[in-house]
């Protein structure tokens, strides 16, 4: 079957299509209804069926290939490596499941996980899935008041954390941040379970705090039966990053999530049992949830949990892992590749990467210079894919198992099965033509694996995502265009639009142009208020040649050259009013550019919540650049 036929069947006959894909996982009780869409926009998949994520990820493969590698935990920060076969992982998950039950955690209870990228984090999430508890991972980069808000929203029965994590040689004091968060929260968890890594001193709270290792010793050899869950019971809550005010918890189911991930591993990611999948993300983000915690294991692959940066202790660290563990498939974000692009390629090519078959990139738009560089350097297909926290798996990609069309630089590919993607005119709501920019939406119902609702707030779910044009379309909040061959291009957020004297431009379009200039390593473009034009674009550039930063005359020449390039590629209306050169740009710890923060600084406004920022010194660089 061609991909076109596969895709059209998913749109024209969604129930028959997804009933077939559901055979990829084990069901204890068969489902009686593939889709219940009687209360749009809410969609319920595989109704009446019972299954379990942990069973499908661990037990199923323990029975088929007990001695195959399942979990590889690597920390370049502490120079530790631990490996678990499927048999060993099964044993550890049962122990932790018994620990959770001993602390009174029941089916449907929330367990908040605030942990570094260590094996215990992965095992804890699988243990939650085993007993039917709902896990809610809070990214380790969040500060205390943000953690407190998530505690109050999820109301966990238990919090699992650690003394500390590490990043770039710096210790991140998780326990101290967590203590501060609990002090600020209204909801008080009964217990806090702590992994003591010996990285930071902890203040223990009697009666509340428990040592992970001590409790583990009490449950060695435990066997905990799987809780068979109705497909639409909640598996997890994952809060979207950068949220202000009340957190927005994306709620996901059990059966639909398992089926979607299992299908994606086969058709999109080419996962084969016995292989090794290295997703260089964090379990606190959706990419980590889907493609570290669950999807590789669902496919019978080993999954790598990595603590550290791509450049610490040196920029060869990822490639050492690829070589040592014979990684077949790798998943990262364009930001990490841009960082690596600044270093000599010899530090990559010195490693035997012959096992690597493909690199997948997602999380932000992939610019053409970065795509070209990494494709040439690694010598393997580089496959962009586009999705969101809310979708849980790719909305757009290239399904290599079914589709041999070539990648197109700058494009995340074509809509994936189940996603009835449309581009609509922002004013009329009518479909856009070829190469016509529009708002990217998805016709309901959303396919399996996507957001069920916002935790505890159905009304907010409907208002936030389903209120465009009085139609049953899900708003992605992204601009896009489609070319004559059906490839899509993402042009940036609908709220990252610059209106320059009546010309509406996505920041992505200007960034793409500037990125093609030879001396540009990375760029961020924002729109700021202007008395004459309403808004103007300004650009902050990290140059490849750092002497640009020291020589004002050289910087002025480079600025003029970049402006001329934008004039030529987009038009004079797209030309930035200023191009400033900096050595770093404000980003979250997951690599997302903080464009709104940059914009606020440029306009003299309060930049707001900065709890997720990686390096606060980058803000000072922005301030200094605009003052000079």
Curated annotation (Swiss-Prot):
Reactions this protein catalyses: propanoate + ATP + CoA = propanoyl-CoA + AMP + diphosphate
EC number of this enzyme: 6.2.1.17
Pathway(s) this gene product operates in, as recorded in its UniProt entry: Organic acid metabolism; propanoate degradation
Entry keyword set: ATP-binding, Ligase, Nucleotide-binding
A molecular-function term among this protein's GO annotations: ATP binding
GO term, biological process aspect, one: propionate catabolic process, 2-methylcitrate cycle
Database matches in PROSITE patterns: AMP_BINDING (PS00455)
Class of enzymatic activity (EC top level): ligase
Signal sequence, start to end: none
A Pfam family annotated for this UniProt entry: AMP-binding_C
InterPro entries in the cross-refs: ACAS_N, AMP-bd_C, AMP-bd_C_sf, AMP-binding_CS, AMP-dep_synth/lig_dom, ANL_N_sf, Propion_PrpE
Chain's role: Catalyzes the synthesis of propionyl-CoA from propionate and CoA. Also converts acetate to acetyl-CoA but with a lower specific activity.
Family, per entry: Belongs to the ATP-dependent AMP-binding enzyme family.
Name of the protein in its database record: Propionate--CoA ligase
Organism of origin: Salmonella typhimurium (strain LT2 / SGSC1412 / ATCC 700720)
Encoding gene (name): prpE
